[in-house]
Swiss-Prot record:
Family per similarity comment: Belongs to the glutamate--cysteine ligase type 2 family. EgtA subfamily.
Gene3D superfamilies: 3.30.590.20
Gene symbol of the encoding locus: egtA
Involved pathway(s): Amino-acid biosynthesis; ergothioneine biosynthesis
Top EC class, one word: ligase
Species of the source: Mycolicibacterium smegmatis (strain ATCC 700084 / mc(2)155) (Mycobacterium smegmatis)
Molecular function in Gene Ontology: ATP binding; glutamate-cysteine ligase activity
Disulfide bond residue pairs: none
Name by which UniProt lists this protein: Glutamate--cysteine ligase EgtA
Record-linked Pfam families: GCS2 (PF04107)
The keyword Disulfide bond is annotated on this UniProt entry: no
Record-annotated membrane-spanning stretches: none
Length: 423
C-alpha cells in the first residue's frame, strides 16, 4: 500500500488514451501473467505500540529513525510504513510457501528486535483495538485519499481502513492462461472461509464491535466500486472483468507530484473517453497504472494474484494460515476439494466477518480446508498447523483469544502483552 505518487518522466511526451476501450486493452494485457505456479510472496502488517504507553501513537519521525537503524534483513523484505504507523514487511517471491514463511519469520525477528530496543512493539491484530484513528504518514497519496473519502461520505471508514487495519497478504502466481478463470474463482470462493479462520479484529477504537473481523467490516463500509470483489456472475474471463471493474471505479487522485485529490465521482472510463477532464488532460498509461494501485478488492490482479482478505494474525498462526491458503490454490487435488467445500459459503463475506466460525456452514468448510492443508504440511509447520487445526475444531477464531485476554486484563494491558511478545 505504501506507494509514492509518481509522474511520467523522461523527454518523451506521455501518450494519452483516446478511449476507455484503449485503456481496457492495456489493463487486460497486463492483469495476469501466463506461466507456471509455485512462487509465493508474503506481506505482513503490524501495529506499532509504545511499550510504556500503548495509547500513544509513535510519530512519523520516530518510526523513520527506528527503521533507518534496522540492519539488513536476511530474507530480503522491504520495510514500509502505513498511513497510521503500522509497519509492513513485504517479502520477495520464493519457491513455495515454506521458503517464503521462513524468510519472513527471519525478517520479522530482526525488525522486532530493533523496535524493542526503542521500547516499541509490533502487534499482529487485524485492527488497532485501542487508539483513535489518526494518520502519521505525511505522504501526499494518503492526504489525497483522506480528502477523497471525506468527499465520498466515507470519511470514518476511510480513516479506519488507512490507519487502523492490518493484514497478511499472500501473493501467488496467476498460473497458466487456460486455468485463470478457475484459479481466480477459487481465490474468491475461499475468501469467506479464510476470513472466518483468521478473523482477528474484534475491537476498534477501544470498543468491541460485535464482529470477529472488524477489519473486513471496515472494508465493507467503503464503496464496492473500489473495494468489492472483482468477479461478476460467471467469472469466466478475469482479465476482462478486472478491466471493467477498474474502468468503472472512480479516480481517487491525479498522478502528479502533488497527488491532487479528485473529490467528485469520476469513473476512469469517463476520463479516458473525454467525458471528464482531470489535470487538464486525458489519462496516460502511468495514470492508469497508478489508478490500479488505488483499488482494493479482496483479490487484486497484479500480473500475479494479490490475496488481501486475511487479518493480521499471531506469529504462531500466520505460517499455517499462509500454507493453508497457498495449498488450497496450488495443489490441484486440494483445490478441487476446497472448491466443493466452500461452494455453499463462497459469497458469505459479511457473515464470515461478523460470525467467524460460529456459523455452522463456514465451520464445516473451514474444517475441510484446514484438514486438506494439514495432510500436506511439512514437518517445519507441524506446530503452527496443529494450533490452527485445534482452533478451527473448537470453532474459535484468533479474535476469540484476544477478546478473552481483553476481558481478563483490560485493553491496554492486553495490547502491551502482545507488544512485548507475551502469549
Amino acid at each position: 500500500m505504501a506507494l509514492p505518487a509518481r509522474s511520467d518522466s523522461g523527454c518523451a511526451v506521455p501518450v494519452e488514451f483516446t478511449s476507455a476501450e484503449q485503456a481496457a486493452a492495456h489493463i487486460g494485457a497486463n492483469s495476469l501473467q501466463d506461466g507456471p505456479i509455485g512462487r509465493v510472496g508474503l506481506e505482513i502488517e503490524a501495529h506499532c505500540f509504545d511499550l510504556s504507553n500503548p495509547t500513544r501513537r509513535p510519530s512519523w519521525d520516530e518510526l523513520s529513525a527506528v527503521i533507518a537503524d534496522v540492519p539488513p534483513l536476511p530474507g530480503g523484505s522491504r520495510i514500509t510504513v502505513e498511513p497510521g504507523g503500522a509497519v509492513e514487511l513485504s517479502g520477495p517471491p520464493y519457491d513455495g510457501p515454506l521458503a517464503a514463511v521462513a524468510a519472513l519469520q527471519a525478517d520479522r525477528a530482526v525488525l522486532r528486535a530493533e523496535f524493542a530496543r526503542r521500547n516499541l512493539g509490533l502487534v499482529l491484530l487485524g485492527t488497532d483495538p485501542l487508539r483513535p484513528t489518526r494518520r502519521v504518514n505525511p505522504g501526499a497519496r494518503y492526504s489525497a485519499m483522506e480528502q477523497f473519502f471525506t468527499a465520498s461520505g466515507t470519511a470514518e471508514a476511510g480513516a479506519a481502513m488507512m490507519t487502523a487495519t492490518a493484514s497478511v497478504q499472500v501473493n501467488l502466481d496467476a498460473g497458466p492462461r487456460d486455468g485463470w478463470a478457475e484459479r481466480v474463482r477459487l481465490a474468491h470462493a475461499l475468501g469467506p472461509t479464510m476470513i472466518a479462520i483468521t478473523a482477528n479484529s474484534p475491537m476498534l477504537g477501544g470498543q468491541f464491535t460485535g464482529w470477529c473481523s472488524t477489519r473486513q467490516r471496515v472494508w465493507g463500509q467503503l464503496d464496492s466500486a473500489r473495494c468489492g470483489p472483482v468477479l461478476g456472475v460467471d467469472g469466466d474471463d478475469p482479465a476482462s472483468e478486472w478491466a471493467r471493474y477498474a474502468l468503472r471505479a472512480p479516480v481517487m487522485l491525479v498522478n502528479s507530484p502533488d497527488a491532487v485529490p479528485v473529490t467528485n465521482w469520476v469513473p476512469f472510463a469517463d476520463w479516458a473517453d473525454g467525458r471528464a477532464v482531470l489535470g487538464g488532460r486525458r489519462p496516460t498509461e502511468a495514470d492508469l497504472d497508478y489508478h490500479l494501485t488505488t483499488l482494493f478488492p479482496p483479490v487484486r490482479p497484479r500480473r500475479w494474484l494479490e490475496i488481501r482478505y486475511l487479518d493480521s494474525v499471531p506469529d504462531a498462526l500466520w505460517p499455517a494460515a499462509v500454507f493453508t491458503l497457498t495449498t488450497l490454490l496450488d495443489d490441484p487435488v486440494a483445490a478441487e476439494s476446497a472448491a466443493e467445500a466452500t461452494r455453499p459459503v463462497a459469497t458469505a463475506w459479511d457473515r464470515a466477518a461478523r460470525m467467524g466460525l460460529t456459523d455452522r456452514h463456514l465451520h464445516t468448510a473451514a474444517l475441510t480446508c484446514v484438514r486438506l492443508a494439514a495432510e500436506r504440511a511439512p514437518a517445519e509447520l507441524e506446530e503452527s498447523m496443529t494450533l490452527l487445526m485445534r482452533s478451527v475444531q473448537q470453532r474459535r477464531s484468533p479474535a476469540d483469544d484476544f477478546s478473552d485476554r481483553v476481558v481478563a486484563r483490560g485493553i491496554a494491558a492486553a495490547v502491551r502483552e502482545l507488544a512485548k511478545g507475551e502469549l
